[in-house]
């Protein structure tokens, strides 16, 4: 059984799934769209490196194996229709909603839940909404929150070794066959904000038309390769 989303194709078998990364890049709930040759392979390898790192930190991920150049072999998950965002600094939609200066530190990691729904612009919800709407139980939501914060702090530490700042990051979670909450989808410049001395190394380059996003994505991959080998 196959599924195709905006940036990935999922091929499901009995035991495993194959996540094939496309070269598409989107923004604004899919209203902005381009194809960048090579992006899929960059995001696939970046995801593989970072998920392997998180697994070593005790965080359950769906990664089984990276199959070059653009495919991940993963554990099949029943995905929650959610984006789980962890913010370390004020940026993006947080500033639009609440004000403040982009790049200001938040006192503690802030976790937000958004329903994946482009037509409704991914509405933000609380744990009570998740329960009432039948999306996730309170226990599942707490497990997602706990794993998301733990992963974010681990990745913050990873990038700080090269003096990069992780500002925020989006995760997606699902349930494995035993009902465990597991980190799925991807971890790449498509899903996090990464900065160094004011320079942008993430999808904001594309959102804001600030240059060649593929160049920045390649630099992030090279950074991950270098840090992973240390």
UniProtKB/Swiss-Prot annotation:
Superkingdom classification of source: Bacteria
Matches recorded under PROSITE patterns: SAICAR_SYNTHETASE_1
Presence of keyword Transcription: no
Pathway noted in the entry: Purine metabolism; IMP biosynthesis via de novo pathway; 5-amino-1-(5-phospho-D-ribosyl)imidazole-4-carboxamide from 5-amino-1-(5-phospho-D-ribosyl)imidazole-4-carboxylate: step 1/2
PANTHER family for the chain: MULTIFUNCTIONAL PROTEIN ADE2, SI:DKEY-6E2.2
HAMAP family (UniProt xref): SAICAR_synth
Listed name of the protein: Phosphoribosylaminoimidazole-succinocarboxamide synthase
Taxonomic source organism: Thermotoga petrophila (strain ATCC BAA-488 / DSM 13995 / JCM 10881 / RKU-1)
Underlying gene: purC
